[in-house]
């Protein structure tokens, strides 16, 4: 059965409305094991015929059968499979991958057939050694002579068996000696049973073949016909496809890293865009989360289980509402379910003096349960009790700021101070509380019994506000409703008070801070987007620069998905490396910012989000260049410089 059979094959190239037919009704039969030379002058159509024979191109019309199968009906992947398993190409200009060693160039066809690394390393090394290149296995093409490069090309053609060797002007770029060595190799391969199809314009080279076919102006003008091979035909066992998704990905990643090393400066600039984007996202979100946590902590320090009742109708102005909340209201609230403590509060600015030191501060008249209601511990001494309230005792508890201002590091407990010229004895010092979210120093205060303060300091019985602590925070809304109902009933149905829920305040502030954090993250994400555009730009440049390499890989059996996968993974490798470095830089930047007393919160989600976005950026922005590479025409790609 014929190995190759062409019948009425034509090939027409179109450029807009202009059509040029370069092959006219080619009829050709080649038997297994033949050494055929196709000879013709430049422009005769011999290279176009070789491209069709090697499944790099398709005929415009006519029939092409390989071992009885209609090749014209094959899709691109089936043609790639046929090239990978059957054909080996030897090109005039060698077509070696510049950034790969001799061994790596030879291994390319085996990569796409799924041959395990150890096995293909051994086979490539053996082939190169048999061709006299055993000491130049790790040399790159620019370190080899023309004859040595052509021998590497022949070794590559034999890597997957090379049942059919297509040699396009294999001696055209060589000196006489190197050309003779290449022809000796081709004759030896023919003797070993390989089918050799030699394309040349030199008659003396063609005469070394067993059969000479002459082509002129796209037509075969001389062909003595097939010459059956004498003797037994060698056994070219069918290849077993050993490819797997994992091995494909690993090989694509190796190729990607090699490509990045070949253009290290450009790769670094591309990485920089991703690094800046990822680092900005992580640092910005850490700052935003830190600011949110700081505000929430400050509000929480005032109590998360608190309800605050203030006098005055909500959303109304111009009314005298200062006397609408009284002590009996607080006593009634204490009897409601889920109320842990309810304390009255009055306050005013006072001058407190000890010896020669005086200090302007806020005096807060409150109840004995204040520390329970506000969960504010005593640092030294004690807080006043119910007996002090009943007896109108002139006792006070100092905040940390006041104690420091009047007594320095000395212990003020038991000492006497003048508050607006009234003598008070210091019972204790409150624990540090810090500033409110609005910047007010909570430690710049003194506490006195409500009865004493209202009578001797403020001269009024109505309250500035009442603080209510609930036992079960989950039921705080129900408790708020009960307080509202109670006070409205006590005030004759008039809503002349306001109730503020600290849990709601925290929730509202958290939502606001979350919005600001998202805004910060969005601004930072724009940097990542710009980095992604940089990845796409560089990958498009890479595809353009490596067009010939893509053609070489297609000629040696790479399918569309292999090329797509290779360039997509290359983009992902760039993005992943940039993501990893960006995470480190982002965390480092956050740590530096934290050293300047800026609140920072480290958490895994922003890191994972930033890295995931970087990875997704590589996937999205790498797809278009990868798709462009995968859709290249092998013949056009090989012809690219």
UniProtKB/Swiss-Prot annotation:
Binding site residues for ATP: 40-47
Major localisation: membrane
Enzyme category, top tier: translocase
GO molecular function: ATP binding; ATP hydrolysis activity; transmembrane transporter activity
The enzyme's E.C. designation: 7.6.2.-
PANTHER family for this protein: MACROLIDE EXPORT ATP-BINDING_PERMEASE PROTEIN MACB, MEMBRANE COMPONENT OF TRANSPORTER-RELATED
Role description: Non-canonical ABC transporter that contains transmembrane domains (TMD), which form a pore in the inner membrane, and an ATP-binding domain (NBD), which is responsible for energy generation. Confers resistance against macrolides.
Quaternary state and interactors: Homodimer.
Protein name (record): Macrolide export ATP-binding/permease protein MacB
Lineage of the organism: Bacteria, Pseudomonadati, Pseudomonadota, Betaproteobacteria, Rhodocyclales
Gene: macB
